[in-house]
Amino acid sequence: MSIQVFCDFDGTITNNDNIMSIMEKFAPPEAEEVKNRILSQELSIQEGVSQLFQLIPTNLHDEIIQFLIETAEIRNGFHEFIQFVNENNISFYVISGGMDFFVYPLLQGLIPKEQIYCNETDFSNEYITVNWPHPCDRHCQNHCGLCKSSLIRKLGDTNDFHIVIGDSITDLQAAKQADKVFARDFLITKCEENHISYTPFETFHDVQTELKHLLEVKL
């Protein structure tokens, strides 16, 4: 049995949710209602996120990138955590509902591109269009956009020990099928509502300590 780690990006690897930061900085006021409808599960993630980015003009591309480079912060302990998983031959994947135009640059030099799964964006028209290269498989009907539970089924083996690390509603379906969940922020609320066992964390030092203990127990 091998251990596989599936980790969210926005609000998990980074301290802030980059999509929400973009919306607060660049989107018109109606983005707030869309955001609330996503969180209340009135809108599917795919539909809601598509609507949010359709509010952002594509001519802001360079300004958005510069804004994120200046404001996005990698969560404390992440660099050491990646070193730890590499040293212990633990498979690590970033499964992000975020967008290629900011996920790849912010993780450059940290995570190989082939271990990153995120959404794609099209800037060829007046407003940003989101493309969804990792949709739900036949086992999921939640219109996730990037379907994290489907990616776990695709990348993992039924005999593997699956760990999910996340912070929000977008991580809920993955958490439902994980063997162990590390949760913070809104994902804690959703785990408790759905009676999903979880370990809270604030830094990746917390996750590394727990994972080290898990390795000792399983070995």
From Swiss-Prot:
GO terms for biological process: L-methionine salvage from methylthioadenosine. Gene3D superfamilies: 3.90.1470.20, HAD superfamily/HAD-like (3.40.50.1000). CDD domains: HAD_Pase. Its EC number is 3.1.3.87. Signal peptide: none annotated. One of its GO terms (molecular function) is 2-hydroxy-3-keto-5-methylthiopentenyl-1-phosphate phosphatase activity. Pathway: Amino-acid biosynthesis; L-methionine biosynthesis via salvage pathway; L-methionine from S-methyl-5-thio-alpha-D-ribose 1-phosphate: step 4/6. InterPro entries: HAD-like_hydrolase_phosphatase (IPR050849), HAD-like_sf (IPR036412), HAD-SF_hydro_IB_MtnX (IPR017718), HAD_hydro_PyrdxlP_Pase-like (IPR006384), HAD_sf (IPR023214). Disulfide bonds: none annotated. The keyword Hydrolase applies. It catalyses: 2-hydroxy-5-methylsulfanyl-3-oxopent-1-enyl phosphate + H2O = 1,2-dihydroxy-5-(methylsulfanyl)pent-1-en-3-one + phosphate. The keyword Acyltransferase does not apply. Keywords: Amino-acid biosynthesis, Hydrolase, Methionine biosynthesis. Belongs to the HAD-like hydrolase superfamily. MtnX family. Dephosphorylates 2-hydroxy-3-keto-5-methylthiopentenyl-1-phosphate (HK-MTPenyl-1-P) yielding 1,2-dihydroxy-3-keto-5-methylthiopentene (DHK-MTPene). This is 2-hydroxy-3-keto-5-methylthiopentenyl-1-phosphate phosphatase. It comes from Bacillus thuringiensis subsp. konkukian (strain 97-27).
